[in-house]
Amino acid sequence: MISIKPGIYRHSKKGGEYRVLGTAAHSETLEPMVVYEALYENPVSQLWVRPAGMFEELVEINGRKVPRFVLVREK
């Protein structure tokens, strides 16, 4: 079960904000995925998909473990 709520999230390393649109399943593996949209101009893409486990994992920043994405406000 995916516990990621729709809303606005901030990327802990890069600082950009993203709107989580929802969750999905990979068509071949059924791996849970998060579908999200950059809230800034991005020349590569506005829509992104990331494995849910990776979206929720902790990353190291300045020697501290913090969530990769932090919920700023719920939808």
Model-derived segments and spans:
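Mixed-charge, low-complexity intrinsically disordered regions
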Residues: 1-75
